[in-house]
Regions:
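Short, polar/charged alpha-helical segment
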Residues: 28-55, 132
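Extracytoplasmic ligand-binding site segments that recognize negatively charged/polar headgroups
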Residues: 33-34, 39-40, 60-66, 78-210
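A ligand-binding cleft/hinge motif common to bilobed small-molecule-binding domains
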Residues: 89-93, 212-232
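Short beta-strand->loop
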Residues: 101-109, 121-123, 150, 229-240, ...
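Periplasmic-binding protein-like
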Residues: 128, 186-189, 195-196, 227-252, ...
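A bilobed periplasmic-binding-protein/Venus flytrap-type ligand-binding module shared by bacterial periplasmic
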Residues: 131-138, 174, 242-254, 273-274
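Mature extracytoplasmic/periplasmic domains
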Residues: 240, 249-307
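Conserved C-terminal helix/tail region of periplasmic/extracytoplasmic solute-binding proteins
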Residues: 306-331
C-alpha cells in the first residue's frame, strides 16, 4: 500500500514538474525573408543562449510575408511576433499604421544606426550593400565610380535587375537617380544597358559572361566568388546601403521572447554570423567579410546615398515606369 502511494506521489510530482516546465517555456513566431543558411545559424545560436524559448520561423520573400500579414490582419490577428526583412518601406508603412511595438534594444548604444528618424519602431539588424559586380575575364580594371559603367567595355553588356520584380533593385535605381538625376538613366539607356529579372539572375548572367557587369547584391556576389566565379565586387564613392530592419509586431503574444530575440540579433555573436554571409554588420567590433571592398560598416553608412523612405515609397510606381520606358527606348 505504502509503495503504491509513494509511486502515485512521485508520478504526481513528475506531472507537476513537467507542467511547470512547460509553462516556463516561451514561444515566438518570426517572419523573415533572410535565406535559410543565415536564419538557421541564427536560430541555433539563439537556442544555445535561450533554451527555454522555442522559435517558429517562417521564411519567404518580403512580398509574400507582407501579403500574409495583410491576410492575418483582415482575420483579426497577426500571428507573427517579429518581422525581419530588407524591404524598409514596408516597415515605414507598418509604423504609420500603428502595427509596430516600440522597443529600443538593450544594446542599442553599441550599434551603427542608419535611421535618422529612429524611434524604436524598428532597428537595423544588418546593412546590405549593392555595388558594381564585374566579370574579371572581360573587365580587367575594377570600376571606381558609377560613371565607369557608361564606358565602351560595358556597352550592351551591363545589367540591372528589373525594379518591378526586385525591391533592392528599385532601391538602387531610386538612390542613383536621387544622387545623379535622371541623366544617369539616360546614359544607361544610351549605353544599351539591359534589364534582367531578379537580383540573382543578373549576377548569374555576369558570371556566365552573358553580361560583363551589373548592379549586384553583396552576399549573392560573394557566395558566387566563393564557389569559383570569376567575379569582382566594387564600390563607387557613393555606396548603396540597404538596411534590413527587425521589428516587434504590436500586440505580440510573446513580447518578452520577441525582445530577447531582437537583443540577441544585435549581439556580437549574432552579428558575426551575419557578417560571415557577406553583408555588413551593425557593430564596429565585428570583422567584415574579407571580400567586401570597404574598411568598416560605419564608413559605408557615412558614404551611403541618403534615403527619404517616404518619397521612395510614394514615387515607386512612376519611377519604375519611367526607368523601364527609358531603357526600352519608349521615352
Amino acid at each position: 500500500m505504502h509503495r503504491r502511494m509513494l509511486t502515485a506521489a512521485v508520478a504526481a510530482c513528475l506531472v507537476m514538474s513537467q507542467a511547470v516546465k512547460a509553462s516556463a517555456e516561451e514561444k515566438m513566431i518570426l517572419y523573415t525573408s533572410m535565406k535559410e543558411s543565415l536564419i538557421g545559424s541564427i536560430y541555433e545560436a539563439f537556442k544555445k543562449k535561450h533554451p527555454d524559448i522555442t522559435i517558429d520561423y517562417q521564411s519567404a520573400g518580403a512580398g509574400k510575408l507582407m501579403a500574409k500579414i495583410a491576410t492575418e490582419r483582415q482575420a483579426g490577428k497577426v500571428l507573427a511576433d517579429v518581422l525581419w526583412t530588407s524591404e524598409v518601406p514596408d516597415f515605414y508603412n507598418l509604423k504609420s499604421e500603428g502595427m509596430l511595438e516600440k522597443y529600443t534594444p538593450s544594446n542599442f548604444d553599441e550599434l551603427i544606426n542608419p535611421f535618422d528618424d529612429y524611434d524604436g519602431s524598428f532597428t537595423a539588424a544588418r546593412l546590405g550593400t549593392l555595388g558594381i559586380v564585374y566579370n574579371t575575364r572581360f573587365i580587367k580594371e575594377a570600376p571606381t565610380k558609377w560613371e565607369d559603367v557608361f564606358g565602351k567595355d560595358y556597352k550592351g553588356a551591363f545589367g540591372v535587375a528589373n525594379p518591378a520584380l526586385s525591391g533592392t533593385s528599385y532601391m538602387s535605381i531610386a538612390l542613383l537617380i536621387k544622387q545623379f538625376g535622371w541623366e544617369f538613366v539616360d546614359k544607361l539607356a544610351a549605353n544599351k544597358t539591359k534589364i534582367g529579372k531578379g537580383s540573382g539572375q543578373v549576377i548569374d548572367d555576369t558570371a556566365s559572361g552573358e553580361l560583363v557587369a551589373c548592379i549586384g547584391v553583396d552576399y549573392i556576389t560573394l557566395n558566387k566568388i566563393k564557389k569559383g566565379a570569376k567575379l569582382g565586387y566594387a564600390f563607387a564613392p557613393e555606396v548603396i546601403v540597404v538596411p534590413s530592419p527587425v521589428a516587434i509586431i504590436k500586440g505580440a503574444d510573446n513580447l518578452s521572447a520577441a525582445q530577447k530575440f531582437v537583443d540577441f540579433l544585435l549581439t556580437k555573436e549574432a552579428q558575426e554570423i551575419i557578417a560571415s554571409e557577406g553583408t555588413l554588420p551593425v557593430r564596429n567590433d565585428v570583422k567584415l567579410h574579407p571580400d567586401l571592398p570597404i574598411s568598416s560598416a560605419e564608413e559605408a553608412v557615412k558614404r551611403s546615398i541618403k534615403i527619404d523612405y517616404d518619397a521612395l515609397k510614394d514615387q515607386k510606381e512612376t519611377t519604375i515606369k519611367r526607368f523601364s520606358d527609358t531603357l526600352q527606348g519608349k521615352k
